[in-house]
């Protein structure tokens, strides 16, 4: 008899990947995914701890689930097994049971491969099970083969953890030290997703370009080596990777952008600030001049490359001059798309202990100014595509029956009106007819 599994995923692409793997783990035990939380036998919150008040948002969601559980009890129905997974689970640990005693399982991002055993114990009336172990190779050695196809574009996690210890960030504390997967293990998973219909693979890591796997005869495989290896797979058309750190942009990786046609001309390369003073305070391990040099070398290797980045405004000690340095960097680099946020102190990080916190209204003002600049650049990038013909990978249906959506080599979403759903999963030449801030509109030639 099948049972229903509901997973709510927060945060980054890594969590999306982990959620798919949780489905794959539990499927052999009779659990099938559902989008209806009310009919779920197991409810998993796969949480993110990056943004402000992440833990409180998790507790709020758990409160809503508690009300659902109470309703089920009144109706004489069995309660669902409740699991808190991901980075909030890693950070909060036993505190989750203290504040929400109706939660059954707390499991970290490196140990969720034990979910089948943990759930089985709860079914046998165990209580409050927790697994937050960091055993580097155990996670990937115990994950199953792909059972649920991800579609035309698939994620594969190749690197986890972070050794950089930026002073604003909790990732080193929730994901652990940097660890790279076995290159052949990655290759086998890539073969699987391609055989399942994937045309594009996005390699994931907290610092994916820190990928560094030691193979036989002490050969070290870099991310560039891994990309070259994967590019040999027949029927795999596109390769991407994220998220990268500037100090790990090696010469061979930069040059690969100019020599490997399957490596897409789009790169997300977070810089966070344009001020050398703030970069040092953030412990970013590079200055703005180093970042400019990488950008110049990338554009020499691949002139049409489109760049993306992350920015934090209002880091402690940021002056008006520091913020102007960030605006100057943005204007000099010219991005295709970006993500920008107000600094929020994360408990346990050095930035949270600083006494020179920036008032909220100043952070809001700076974010508004920065986002206006970034949106202008994003719109200009999209408008530059109008009238051109671009190869688009169609990977999903739109909200209208006759609409399908794909993405360009530059990661822009493209909408077309076409009732022929057989185009999904295919790469088609599309003439771009219209551009907006967040998408393009086109027609098939």
Swiss-Prot record:
Domain TRAM stretches: 383-445
MTTase N-terminal domain mapped to chain residues: 3-124
EC nos: 2.8.4.3
Binding-site positions, [4Fe-4S] cluster 2: 162, 166, 169
Keywords: 4Fe-4S, Cytoplasm, Iron, Iron-sulfur, Metal-binding, S-adenosyl-L-methionine, Transferase, tRNA processing
Main location: cytoplasm
Subcellular location: Cytoplasm
Binding-site positions, [4Fe-4S] cluster 1: 12, 48, 87
Top-level class of the enzyme under EC nomenclature: transferase
Presence of the UniProt keyword Kinase in the record: no
GO function term, MF aspect, one: metal ion binding
Cofactor binding note: Binds 2 [4Fe-4S] clusters. One cluster is coordinated with 3 cysteines and an exchangeable S-adenosyl-L-methionine.
Gene Ontology cellular component list: cytosol
Family in the record: Belongs to the methylthiotransferase family. MiaB subfamily.
Described function: Catalyzes the methylthiolation of N6-(dimethylallyl)adenosine (i(6)A), leading to the formation of 2-methylthio-N6-(dimethylallyl)adenosine (ms(2)i(6)A) at position 37 in tRNAs that read codons beginning with uridine.
Subunit-structure text: Monomer.
Name of the molecule in the record: tRNA-2-methylthio-N(6)-dimethylallyladenosine synthase
Organism: Rickettsia akari (strain Hartford)
Gene giving rise to this polypeptide: miaB
């Amino acid at each position: 008899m099948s049972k229903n599994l509901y997973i709510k995923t927060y945060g980054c692409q890594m969590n999306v990947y982990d959620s798919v793997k949780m489905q794959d783990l539990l499927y052999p035990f009779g659990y099938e995914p559902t989008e209806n939380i009310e009919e779920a036998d197991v409810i998993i919150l796969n949480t993110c701890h990056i943004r402000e008040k992440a833990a409180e948002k998790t507790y709020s969601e758990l409160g809503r689930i508690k009300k659902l559980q109470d309703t089920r009890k009144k109706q004489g129905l069995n309660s669902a097994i409740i699991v808190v997974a991901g980075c909030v689970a890693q950070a909060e640990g036993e505190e989750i049971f203290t504040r929400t005693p109706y939660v059954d399982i707390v499991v970290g991002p490196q140990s969720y491969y034990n979910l089948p055993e943990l759930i089985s114990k709860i079914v046998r009336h165990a209580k409050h099970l927790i697994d937050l172990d960091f055993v580097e190779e155990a996670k990937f050695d115990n994950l199953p083969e792909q059972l649920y196809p991800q579609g035309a574009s698939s994620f594969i996690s190749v690197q986890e953890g972070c050794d950089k210890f930026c002073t604003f960030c909790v990732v080193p504390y929730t994901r652990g030290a940097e660890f790279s997967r076995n290159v052949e293990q990655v290759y086998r998973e890539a073969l699987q997703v391609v055989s399942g219909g994937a045309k594009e693979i996005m390699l994931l890591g907290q610092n994916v370009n820190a990928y560094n796997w030691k193979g036989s005869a002490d050969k070290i495989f870099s991310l560039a080596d891994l990309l070259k290896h994967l590019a040999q797979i027949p029927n795999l058309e596109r390769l991407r990777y994220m998220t990268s750190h500037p100090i790990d942009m090696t010469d061979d990786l930069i040059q690969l952008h100019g020599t490997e046609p399957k490596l897409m001309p789009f790169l997300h390369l977070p810089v966070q600030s344009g001020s050398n003073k703030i970069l040092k305070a953030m412990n970013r391990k590079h200055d703005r001049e180093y970042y400019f040099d990488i950008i110049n070398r990338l554009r020499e290797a691949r002139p049409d490359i489109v760049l993306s980045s992350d920015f934090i405004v209002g880091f402690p000690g940021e002056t008006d001059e520091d913020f102007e340095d960030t605006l100057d960097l943005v204007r000099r680099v010219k991005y295709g798309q970006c993500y920008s946020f107000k600094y929020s102190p994360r408990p346990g990080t050095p930035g949270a202990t600083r006494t020179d916190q920036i008032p909220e209204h100043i952070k809001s003002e700076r974010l508004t100014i920065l986002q206006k600049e970034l949106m202008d650049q994003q719109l200009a990038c999209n408008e530059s595509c109008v009238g051109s013909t671009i190869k688009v990978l169609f990977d999903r249906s739109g909200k209208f029956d006759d609409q399908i959506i794909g993405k360009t080599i530059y990661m822009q979403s493209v909408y077309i009106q076409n009732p022929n759903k057989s185009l999904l999963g295919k790469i088609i030449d599309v003439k771009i007819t219209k551009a907006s801030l967040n998408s393009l509109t086109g027609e098939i030639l």
